[in-house]
Design a protein with these regions (language model features):
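A bilobed periplasmic-binding-protein/Venus flytrap-type ligand-binding module shared by bacterial periplasmic
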Residues: 112-122, 218-232
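A ligand-binding cleft/hinge motif common to bilobed small-molecule-binding domains
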Residues: 82-97, 180-205
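Immediate post-signal peptide segment of exported/extracytoplasmic ligand-binding proteins
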Residues: 22-31, 130-136, 276-283
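A conserved helix-loop-strand patch within extracytoplasmic ligand-binding domains
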Residues: 98-145
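Short helix-initiation/N-cap motifs at beta->coil->alpha
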Residues: 37-38, 60-72, 166-177
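Extracytoplasmic "Venus flytrap"
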Residues: 26-45, 66
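Gram-negative bacterial Sec-dependent N-terminal signal peptides
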Residues: 1-23
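Short, polar/charged alpha-helical segment
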Residues: 38-57, 156
Length: 283
């Protein structure tokens, strides 16, 4: 998930969604997602595949901005979304729309942001960076102004890392730096989050954050419109049951997409390979 500062949707964009998201007739649902978030793409496509295969619904996926996704579900123009980071990241959206939507619970637990390192480095906590010269006084970040970058600026101050520089980059740039470091077995600290496909590719861990700068773990929740339970009761029941078991499980799908598979193909392959998980979700 690209942890960008969340922006409110404009009235014009809200009107735009009404023209692109039509109310489907019969057994059909429309689900919103954020195209730039790898976890949103993976989770939404897997859910859509299960809903189509096992519940017999047509599913339309609508890529929208975060604010429009929330407003779309709140107004019933979208039937559901599976990308609500709670209670903090999307806290303002929840506060504004909680009486207009239904929370079907988490589809991923222990979502979090922070500083990530390869398992082979010696540092265990952010505080350890102060005396560990192997990192060469550098933390590799993503987009300047994103939530995790703002928190990292704060962490540098709170932990007294005056000898460190936070390098703004992009998601792709951060991954490129991590790839190079992994190949050379070098120390590197990057800004990141789970769920993310990089945890399926490499052995990584978060540096402990005893000061709590990055906050506690969150959950990624499935949110439905008020009308969903009446319109599509089987889908509503599925959303209550749908939950990833671990970051490695969703990581399989995200990594397949990162390696070039189309999201719908990666989702279909995963559903085919894991019938027992699908059975748990649809019982």
């Amino acid at each position: 998930m690209k942890m960008r500062r969340l922006l409110g949707a404009s009235a014009a964009l809200v009107l735009a969604i009404s023209s692109t998201v039509a109310s489907a007739e019969g057994k059909a649902v429309t689900i919103g997602y954020v195209d730039g978030w790898s976890d949103s793409v993976a989770t939404t496509n897997v859910a859509a595949e299960v809903i189509k295969q096992k519940l017999g619904y047509d599913v339309k996926l609508q890529a929208v901005a975060t604010g429009i996704m929330w407003q779309g579900v709140a107004t019933g123009k979208l039937d559901a979304m599976l990308s609500a980071w709670l209670p903090v990241t999307h806290g303002e959206y929840w506060a504004k729309n909680k009486d207009l939507v239904v929370d079907y619970g988490p589809n991923f637990k222990d979502a979090k942001i922070g500083l990530i390192v390869p398992e082979y480095v010696k540092a265990k906590t952010i505080d350890d960076l102060k005396t560990d010269e192997s990192f060469k006084g550098r933390i590799v970040g993503i987009d300047a102004g994103s939530g995790v970058m703002l928190k990292t600026d704060q962490a540098i101050k709170d932990y007294g890392l005056s000898n460190y520089t936070l390098k703004a980059s992009s998601g792709a740039g951060m991954i490129a730096e991590l790839t190079r470091a992994e190949k050379k077995n070098e120390s590197i600290a990057v800004t990141g989050w789970v769920p993310h496909w990089m945890f399926a590719k490499w052995k990584l861990r978060f540096l402990d954050d005893p000061k709590g700068v990055y906050g506690a773990a969150e959950t990624v929740n499935s949110i439905g419109s008020k009308e969903l339970a009446t319109k599509a009761p089987e889908v509503a029941k599925f959303l209550k049951n749908f939950q990833w078991a671990s970051k490695d499980e969703i990581g399989e799908v995200m990594l397949a997409i990162q390696d070039g598979a189309k999201p719908e193909v990666a989702a279909k392959d995963w559903v085919t390979k894991h019938p027992e998980r699908v059975a748990d979700w649809t019982k």
